[in-house]
UniProtKB/Swiss-Prot annotation:
Keywords from the named record: Isomerase, tRNA processing
Catalytic reactions of this protein: uridine(55) in tRNA = pseudouridine(55) in tRNA
Name listed for the protein in its UniProt record: tRNA pseudouridine synthase B
InterPro entries, A to Z: PsdUridine_synth_cat_dom_sf, PsdUridine_synth_N, tRNA_psdUridine_synth_TruB, TruB_C
CDD domains reported in the protein's UniProt record: PseudoU_synth_EcTruB
Pfam families cross-referenced by the UniProt entry: TruB_C_2 (PF16198), TruB_N (PF01509)
Enzyme class of the recorded protein, top EC level: isomerase
Length: 308
C-alpha cells in the first residue's frame, strides 16, 4: 500500500496515529515522516508496508503551518499545556515593526529545541527528563525558515480566526475550521503562516519571537497545513483511513526527476556510478517506474537506494 496523508486530531501523539493506522489497515508496517505535537493538528504523512522505505527520504520535507503565538505568558512546554511560568505586560505593537522583526527570523539559523521534546541525549529523552523535574543541555540545531507571514494581531487566541480557505489558508467565513487547545488566558496573539525546513520547532520560534519583542510567549495553537507534497485539504480523518486515496511511491518523493534509459537504469540497479550532470538529490525513473534515489555531484550519480 502506498502513502496516506492523515489529519491528526488534537491531543493525540504521532505514535498514536501510527498505532491507529496499524489497527485500521491490518499491518504493523506503518511509519510517519514527521512528528506533530499532541497540542497540534494537521497533516501527518503515513507510509504503509513497502512504502516505509520512503520515510528516510520524506522526513526531511519542508512543512507549512498556521501558528497562533500568544504574547505575555511563557510556559515550560512552550505551548498551551502550561502552567504559566513567566508573565509580562505586552506593550502596544505596530504591524510594520512586527513584520520587520519576523524578517529577522528568515533563512538558515540555529534554534534551541524545547526541553519538552523527543530529542535524545545520552540515552535520555528530553521530555522524560523535563517531566521528572530535570533539564538537559540541548545544543542549538541548524534549521531554516523559508517564509514567515503575519496574518493578523488579535487580543487573544479566542478572538483570532479559526476558519480558513483551504486553497490559500487565509481567514474565511467558510472552509476548514480548526480546534485549538484550551487557552491559558487572554493574551495578545499573533496569527502567522510559516514555511519551514525539517527539524524546525514552532514552539521554539514562539519563544524566540517573544524574546525579540521583549516578552515571554508560547504557542497557543498550531495546524500543519502541508508536509512535502501533501496538503491538509487532501488529508483524511483517522476514521476514514481505509477509504483514503493513496499516493504512489514515485509521486510521494519531492525531488527533481531524471528519466533514465535502459542502460542508466541497469547501472544504477547494479550499484554503479554512471556519469550524469545532476547536482543534488534526485529520483530516477524508467517508463514512469521508480528506479532509484540518487545523489549527484555534477559528474556522477551515487545510488542512495535502488528499486528492483
Amino acid at each position: 500500500m502506498p502513502v496516506i496523508a492523515a489529519d491528526k486530531p488534537l491531543h493525540l501523539t504521532s505514535h498514536d496515529v501510527v498505532n491507529r493506522a496499524r489497527r485500521a489497515l491490518g499491518t504493523k508496517r506503518v511509519g510517519h515522516t514527521g512528528t506533530l505535537d499532541p497540542l497540534a493538528t494537521g497533516v501527518v504523512v503515513l507510509c504503509v508496508d513497502d512504502s516505509t522505505k520512503l520515510v528516510q527520504f520524506m522526513e526531511h520535507d519542508t512543512k507549512e503551518y498556521l501558528a497562533w503565538v500568544s504574547l505575555g505568558a511563557g510556559t515550560p512546554t512552550l505551548d498551551a499545556e502550561g502552567p504559566i511560568e513567566q508573565q509580562a505586560e505586552v506593550p502596544p505593537l505596530d504591524e510594520d515593526h512586527l513584520r520587520e522583526v519576523l524578517k529577522g527570523f528568515l533563512g538558515p539559523q540555529q534554534q534551541i529545541p524545547p526541553q519538552y521534546s523527543a530529542i535524545q541525549i545520552g540515552g535520555q529523552r528530553a521530555y522524560a527528563v523535563a517531566r521528572a523535574g530535570g533539564q538537559l543541555d540541548l545544543p542549538a540545531r541548524d534549521v531554516e525558515i523559508h517564509e514567515l507571514e503575519l496574518i493578523g494581531m488579535f487580543p487573544s487566541v479566542q478572538a483570532a480566526p479559526r476558519t480558513f480557505d483551504p486553497q490559500s489558508w487565509t481567514p474565511a467565513a467558510a472552509g476548514l475550521t480548526f480546534t485549538l487547545p484550551e487557552p491559558l488566558g487572554e493574551f495578545p496573539t499573533l496569527l502567522l503562516r510559516a514555511h519551514v525546513g525539517s527539524g524546525t520547532y514552532l514552539r521554539s520560534l514562539a519563544r524566540d519571537l517573544g524574546a525579540a519583542l521583549g516578552v515571554p510567549a508560547h504557542l497557543g495553537g498550531l495546524v500543519r497545513t502541508r508536509a512535502g507534497r501533501y496538503s491538509l485539504r487532501d488529508a483524511v480523518s483517522l476514521e476514514n483511513l481505509t477509504e483514503a486515496p493513496t499516493i504512489p511511491d514515485l509521486d510521494a518523493l519531492d525531488f527533481p526527476r531524471i528519466e533514465a534509459d535502459e542502460r542508466l537504469a541497469r547501472e544504477l540497479r547494479q550499484g554503479k556510478r554512471p556519469a550524469h550532470p545532476q547536482r543534488g538529490r534526485a529520483v530516477v525513473t524508467l517508463g514512469g517506474e521508480l528506479v532509484a534515489v540518487v545523489d549527484g555531484d555534477g559528474e556522477h550519480l551515487k545510488v542512495v537506494r535502488a528499486w528492483a
